[in-house]
Protein backbone atom coordinates (compact mmCIF):
# COMPACT_ATOMS: atom_id res chain seq x y z
CA UNK A 1 0.00 0.00 0.00
CA UNK A 2 1.29 3.48 -0.87
CA UNK A 3 2.23 5.77 1.96
CA UNK A 4 -0.17 8.39 3.33
CA UNK A 5 1.93 11.23 1.93
CA UNK A 6 1.85 9.86 -1.64
CA UNK A 7 -1.91 9.29 -1.44
CA UNK A 8 -2.48 12.82 -0.14
CA UNK A 9 -0.47 14.21 -3.07
CA UNK A 10 -2.59 12.17 -5.48
CA UNK A 11 -5.81 13.45 -3.90
CA UNK A 12 -4.61 17.04 -4.31
CA UNK A 13 -3.78 16.36 -7.98
CA UNK A 14 -7.21 14.86 -8.70
CA UNK A 15 -8.91 17.80 -6.93
CA UNK A 16 -7.05 20.23 -9.19
CA UNK A 17 -8.18 18.27 -12.25
CA UNK A 18 -11.74 18.29 -10.91
CA UNK A 19 -11.66 22.09 -10.63
CA UNK A 20 -10.55 22.35 -14.26
CA UNK A 21 -13.25 19.98 -15.60
CA UNK A 22 -15.90 21.74 -13.51
CA UNK A 23 -14.87 25.11 -14.94
CA UNK A 24 -14.89 23.69 -18.48
CA UNK A 25 -18.39 22.32 -17.88
CA UNK A 26 -19.68 25.77 -16.90
CA UNK A 27 -17.96 27.45 -19.85
CA UNK A 28 -19.43 24.87 -22.25
CA UNK A 29 -22.92 25.40 -20.78
CA UNK A 30 -22.63 29.16 -21.36
CA UNK A 31 -21.35 28.72 -24.92
CA UNK A 32 -24.07 26.16 -25.65
CA UNK A 33 -26.82 28.63 -24.72
CA UNK A 34 -25.36 31.26 -27.04
CA UNK A 35 -25.01 28.69 -29.84
CA UNK A 36 -28.64 27.64 -29.34
CA UNK A 37 -29.75 31.26 -29.70
CA UNK A 38 -27.83 31.62 -32.98
CA UNK A 39 -29.20 28.29 -34.19
CA UNK A 40 -32.80 29.30 -33.42
CA UNK A 41 -32.27 32.66 -35.13
CA UNK A 42 -30.89 31.16 -38.36
CA UNK A 43 -33.37 28.29 -38.79
CA UNK A 44 -36.35 30.41 -40.01
CA UNK A 45 -34.16 32.00 -42.72
CA UNK A 46 -33.02 28.62 -44.07
CA UNK A 47 -36.56 27.19 -43.99
CA UNK A 48 -38.09 30.25 -45.67
CA UNK A 49 -35.40 30.20 -48.35
CA UNK A 50 -36.26 26.57 -49.11
CA UNK A 51 -39.98 27.38 -49.47
CA UNK A 52 -39.36 30.35 -51.77
CA UNK A 53 -37.11 28.26 -54.02
CA UNK A 54 -39.78 25.56 -54.18
CA UNK A 55 -42.41 28.11 -55.24
CA UNK A 56 -40.19 29.66 -57.92
CA UNK A 57 -38.99 26.31 -59.27
CA UNK A 58 -42.53 24.91 -59.56
CA UNK A 59 -43.82 28.12 -61.12
CA UNK A 60 -41.09 28.26 -63.75
CA UNK A 61 -41.87 25.30 -66.00
CA UNK A 62 -40.00 26.73 -69.01
CA UNK A 63 -36.69 26.96 -67.11
CA UNK A 64 -34.97 24.24 -65.12
CA UNK A 65 -31.88 25.26 -63.20
CA UNK A 66 -29.01 22.70 -63.25
CA UNK A 67 -29.19 22.54 -59.45
CA UNK A 68 -32.71 21.11 -59.78
CA UNK A 69 -31.93 18.45 -62.38
CA UNK A 70 -31.06 14.93 -61.26
CA UNK A 71 -28.19 13.34 -63.17
CA UNK A 72 -26.33 10.05 -62.89
CA UNK A 73 -24.13 10.06 -59.80
CA UNK A 74 -20.57 9.39 -60.95
CA UNK A 75 -18.86 11.73 -58.52
CA UNK A 76 -20.09 12.65 -55.04
CA UNK A 77 -18.97 15.52 -52.81
CA UNK A 78 -19.28 15.87 -49.04
CA UNK A 79 -19.00 19.02 -46.95
CA UNK A 80 -18.21 17.50 -43.55
CA UNK A 81 -18.59 19.75 -40.50
CA UNK A 82 -16.76 18.67 -37.33
CA UNK A 83 -15.21 20.48 -34.36
CA UNK A 84 -11.96 22.41 -34.05
CA UNK A 85 -11.25 21.04 -30.58
CA UNK A 86 -11.63 17.73 -28.76
CA UNK A 87 -12.92 16.84 -25.29
CA UNK A 88 -16.47 16.43 -26.61
CA UNK A 89 -17.04 12.72 -26.15
CA UNK A 90 -17.73 10.61 -29.24
CA UNK A 91 -19.26 13.47 -31.24
CA UNK A 92 -16.68 13.50 -34.05
CA UNK A 93 -16.15 9.73 -34.04
CA UNK A 94 -19.86 9.03 -34.59
CA UNK A 95 -19.98 11.62 -37.39
CA UNK A 96 -16.97 10.14 -39.18
CA UNK A 97 -18.40 6.62 -38.85
CA UNK A 98 -21.63 7.73 -40.53
CA UNK A 99 -19.97 9.54 -43.42
CA UNK A 100 -17.42 6.78 -44.10
CA UNK A 101 -20.25 4.23 -44.25
CA UNK A 102 -22.09 6.41 -46.78
CA UNK A 103 -18.87 6.84 -48.78
CA UNK A 104 -18.43 3.06 -48.82
CA UNK A 105 -21.94 2.65 -50.26
CA UNK A 106 -21.28 5.17 -53.04
CA UNK A 107 -17.93 3.59 -53.90
CA UNK A 108 -19.64 0.20 -54.12
CA UNK A 109 -21.82 1.77 -56.86
CA UNK A 110 -18.72 2.91 -58.74
CA UNK A 111 -18.85 6.59 -57.76
CA UNK A 112 -15.79 8.70 -56.98
CA UNK A 113 -15.80 10.81 -53.82
CA UNK A 114 -14.24 14.08 -52.72
CA UNK A 115 -14.42 16.03 -49.48
CA UNK A 116 -14.62 19.56 -48.16
CA UNK A 117 -13.86 19.29 -44.41
CA UNK A 118 -14.83 22.14 -42.09
CA UNK A 119 -13.25 22.16 -38.62
CA UNK A 120 -9.71 21.18 -37.62
CA UNK A 121 -10.75 17.65 -36.57
CA UNK A 122 -12.48 17.10 -39.91
CA UNK A 123 -9.48 18.39 -41.87
CA UNK A 124 -7.14 16.15 -39.88
CA UNK A 125 -9.35 13.08 -40.35
CA UNK A 126 -9.88 13.35 -44.10
CA UNK A 127 -6.24 14.11 -44.84
CA UNK A 128 -5.36 10.81 -43.15
CA UNK A 129 -8.44 9.05 -44.58
CA UNK A 130 -6.96 9.24 -48.04
CA UNK A 131 -9.80 10.89 -49.96
CA UNK A 132 -9.46 13.89 -52.25
CA UNK A 133 -9.78 17.13 -50.26
CA UNK A 134 -10.90 19.90 -52.64
CA UNK A 135 -11.21 22.69 -50.06
CA UNK A 136 -11.24 23.08 -46.30
CA UNK A 137 -11.87 25.58 -43.52
CA UNK A 138 -11.04 25.62 -39.82
CA UNK A 139 -10.62 28.01 -36.91
CA UNK A 140 -14.13 29.48 -37.27
CA UNK A 141 -14.39 30.08 -33.51
CA UNK A 142 -17.45 30.13 -31.29
CA UNK A 143 -19.33 32.70 -33.41
CA UNK A 144 -18.80 31.71 -37.06
CA UNK A 145 -19.99 34.03 -39.81
CA UNK A 146 -21.42 33.10 -43.19
CA UNK A 147 -18.68 35.14 -44.86
CA UNK A 148 -16.08 32.75 -43.40
CA UNK A 149 -17.65 29.83 -45.31
CA UNK A 150 -18.57 31.34 -48.67
CA UNK A 151 -15.17 30.80 -50.32
CA UNK A 152 -14.99 27.16 -49.25
CA UNK A 153 -18.57 26.36 -50.26
CA UNK A 154 -18.21 28.00 -53.67
CA UNK A 155 -15.28 25.74 -54.52
CA UNK A 156 -17.71 22.81 -54.29
CA UNK A 157 -20.42 24.73 -56.17
CA UNK A 158 -17.94 25.48 -58.95
CA UNK A 159 -17.10 21.78 -59.17
CA UNK A 160 -20.83 21.00 -59.46
CA UNK A 161 -21.29 23.68 -62.13
CA UNK A 162 -18.43 22.20 -64.17
CA UNK A 163 -19.90 18.70 -63.95
CA UNK A 164 -17.11 17.44 -61.67
CA UNK A 165 -19.73 16.61 -59.03
CA UNK A 166 -23.15 15.03 -59.51
CA UNK A 167 -24.23 15.02 -55.85
CA UNK A 168 -23.34 17.33 -52.99
CA UNK A 169 -24.06 16.59 -49.34
CA UNK A 170 -23.51 18.40 -46.06
CA UNK A 171 -22.71 16.29 -42.99
CA UNK A 172 -22.98 17.62 -39.44
CA UNK A 173 -24.21 16.83 -35.94
CA UNK A 174 -27.84 17.91 -35.56
CA UNK A 175 -28.68 19.36 -32.15
CA UNK A 176 -31.67 17.48 -30.71
CA UNK A 177 -31.29 18.42 -27.06
CA UNK A 178 -28.57 18.72 -24.44
CA UNK A 179 -28.22 14.96 -24.10
CA UNK A 180 -28.69 13.97 -27.76
CA UNK A 181 -26.84 15.02 -30.90
CA UNK A 182 -27.42 13.05 -34.10
CA UNK A 183 -25.02 12.91 -37.08
CA UNK A 184 -26.98 13.60 -40.29
CA UNK A 185 -26.24 13.64 -44.02
CA UNK A 186 -28.40 16.13 -45.94
CA UNK A 187 -28.47 16.42 -49.71
CA UNK A 188 -27.72 19.91 -51.00
CA UNK A 189 -27.58 19.31 -54.77
CA UNK A 190 -29.52 18.49 -56.76
CA UNK A 191 -32.07 20.21 -54.58
CA UNK A 192 -34.24 17.45 -53.06
CA UNK A 193 -38.00 17.82 -53.38
CA UNK A 194 -39.92 18.27 -50.16
CA UNK A 195 -43.53 17.29 -49.54
CA UNK A 196 -44.47 20.95 -49.85
CA UNK A 197 -43.05 21.12 -53.39
CA UNK A 198 -45.36 18.46 -54.79
CA UNK A 199 -48.58 20.03 -53.54
CA UNK A 200 -51.05 20.99 -56.24
CA UNK A 201 -53.32 24.03 -56.57
CA UNK A 202 -50.54 26.56 -56.12
CA UNK A 203 -51.13 30.23 -56.58
CA UNK A 204 -49.54 31.81 -59.64
CA UNK A 205 -46.99 34.53 -58.99
CA UNK A 206 -45.48 37.21 -61.18
CA UNK A 207 -41.72 37.32 -60.54
CA UNK A 208 -39.59 40.41 -60.95
CA UNK A 209 -36.95 39.91 -62.25
CA UNK A 210 -37.69 36.68 -64.13
CA UNK A 211 -37.56 33.26 -62.38
CA UNK A 212 -34.21 32.38 -63.98
CA UNK A 213 -32.41 35.32 -62.37
CA UNK A 214 -34.13 34.72 -59.04
CA UNK A 215 -33.16 31.04 -59.01
CA UNK A 216 -29.56 31.80 -60.02
CA UNK A 217 -29.19 33.97 -56.92
CA UNK A 218 -31.40 32.10 -54.46
CA UNK A 219 -30.00 28.61 -55.07
CA UNK A 220 -26.44 29.69 -54.32
CA UNK A 221 -27.57 31.50 -51.20
CA UNK A 222 -29.65 28.50 -50.21
CA UNK A 223 -26.67 26.13 -50.34
CA UNK A 224 -24.54 28.60 -48.39
CA UNK A 225 -27.24 29.06 -45.76
CA UNK A 226 -27.69 25.28 -45.35
CA UNK A 227 -23.97 24.79 -44.77
CA UNK A 228 -23.94 27.70 -42.32
CA UNK A 229 -26.93 26.19 -40.50
CA UNK A 230 -25.00 22.92 -40.29
CA UNK A 231 -22.00 24.71 -38.78
CA UNK A 232 -24.21 26.43 -36.18
CA UNK A 233 -26.00 23.17 -35.30
CA UNK A 234 -22.67 21.38 -34.99
CA UNK A 235 -21.33 24.11 -32.72
CA UNK A 236 -24.32 23.78 -30.38
CA UNK A 237 -23.87 19.99 -30.44
CA UNK A 238 -20.17 20.36 -29.65
CA UNK A 239 -20.78 22.53 -26.59
CA UNK A 240 -23.55 20.23 -25.34
CA UNK A 241 -21.34 17.15 -25.77
CA UNK A 242 -18.42 18.90 -24.07
CA UNK A 243 -20.63 19.99 -21.16
CA UNK A 244 -21.84 16.40 -20.66
CA UNK A 245 -18.31 14.99 -21.01
CA UNK A 246 -16.87 17.46 -18.51
CA UNK A 247 -19.69 16.76 -16.05
CA UNK A 248 -18.93 13.04 -16.30
CA UNK A 249 -15.23 13.76 -15.78
CA UNK A 250 -16.01 15.94 -12.74
CA UNK A 251 -18.24 13.23 -11.25
CA UNK A 252 -15.61 10.56 -11.90
CA UNK A 253 -12.98 12.73 -10.23
CA UNK A 254 -15.26 13.00 -7.19
CA UNK A 255 -15.59 9.20 -7.05
CA UNK A 256 -11.83 8.83 -7.38
CA UNK A 257 -11.25 11.32 -4.55
CA UNK A 258 -13.64 9.39 -2.31
CA UNK A 259 -11.80 6.16 -3.09
CA UNK A 260 -8.39 7.71 -2.48
CA UNK A 261 -9.63 9.29 0.75
CA UNK A 262 -10.67 5.84 1.97
CA UNK A 263 -7.26 4.41 1.07
CA UNK A 264 -5.59 7.38 2.78
CA UNK A 265 -7.60 6.82 5.97
CA UNK A 266 -6.68 3.13 5.98
CA UNK A 267 -3.00 3.93 5.44
CA UNK A 268 -3.07 6.53 8.22
CA UNK A 269 -4.85 4.09 10.54
CA UNK A 270 -2.26 1.40 9.77
CA UNK A 271 0.57 3.83 10.49
CA UNK A 272 -0.98 4.86 13.83
CA UNK A 273 -1.57 1.20 14.76
CA UNK A 274 2.06 0.40 13.97
CA UNK A 275 3.31 3.31 16.08
CA UNK A 276 1.15 2.21 19.01
CA UNK A 277 2.43 -1.35 18.66
CA UNK A 278 6.01 -0.11 18.72
CA UNK A 279 5.34 2.01 21.83
CA UNK A 280 3.68 -0.93 23.62
CA UNK A 281 6.53 -3.25 22.62
CA UNK A 282 9.10 -0.75 23.86
CA UNK A 283 7.28 -0.31 27.17
CA UNK A 284 7.06 -4.08 27.64
CA UNK A 285 10.78 -4.45 27.02
CA UNK A 286 11.54 -1.88 29.73
UniProtKB/Swiss-Prot annotation:
It comes from the Bacteria. It is a peripheral membrane protein. SUPFAM superfamilies: ATP synthase (F1-ATPase), gamma subunit. One of its GO terms (molecular function) is ATP binding. Its main location: membrane. It is found in: Cell inner membrane. Belongs to the ATPase gamma chain family. F-type ATPases have 2 components, CF(1) - the catalytic core - and CF(0) - the membrane proton channel. CF(1) has five subunits: alpha(3), beta(3), gamma(1), delta(1), epsilon(1). CF(0) has three main subunits: a, b and c. Produces ATP from ADP in the presence of a proton gradient across the membrane. The gamma chain is believed to be important in regulating ATPase activity and the flow of protons through the CF(0) complex. This is ATP synthase gamma chain.
Amino acid sequence: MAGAKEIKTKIASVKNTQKITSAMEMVAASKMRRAQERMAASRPYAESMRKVIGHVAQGSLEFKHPYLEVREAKRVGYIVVATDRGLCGGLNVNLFKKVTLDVKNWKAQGAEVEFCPIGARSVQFFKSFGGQVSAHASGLGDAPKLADLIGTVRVMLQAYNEGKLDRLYVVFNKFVNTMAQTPVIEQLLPLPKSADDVKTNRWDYIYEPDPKEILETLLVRYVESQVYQGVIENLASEQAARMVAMKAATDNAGDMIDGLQLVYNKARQAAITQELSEIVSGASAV
